[in-house]
Amino acid sequence: NVLEPFSVTSKSGTLNFSSGDNIIIADGQAKTLRGLDGDDTYFISNLLPKNSTIEVIDTSGSNTIQIATNTKVVKTLWTKDATRLTFEDDKVITINGADNFTFNMGGNVTDGTDGVDLTFAEFALSFGIDDVLNLSGSDTGIITDMYII
């Protein structure tokens, strides 16, 4: 099963969520997704429109970036506390404060699929970035064109 976008463009602006535990599906509804208090799950998949660029900002709670099965990561850029993931069709997500997120690979909060939880350092290592937490600048992942399974 490969998810497909239902919108051809992303909207501008910031979408602020509540202080509860939110499930936030990145589908182009705003340029910036901002969770507030609460333990939020950001569902990242092929639902993003082509050529879209979004940013995730969430500094409170225990938050998770969940990347669905069959989502292809084309390239990655890393700093000690952020990452920029580029998916097929030039879909780009920047996650600020990424060192405080859990990264769930292959899960799907909408159908109960668990997936595998990784720390930021483990997630970076899966793209060939050793010791991401001690980077002094930025580094590009050496593992590219990887499908999440």
Give the ranges of each region predicted by the language model.
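Low-complexity acidic/polar repeat-biased segments
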Residues: 1-7, 82-149
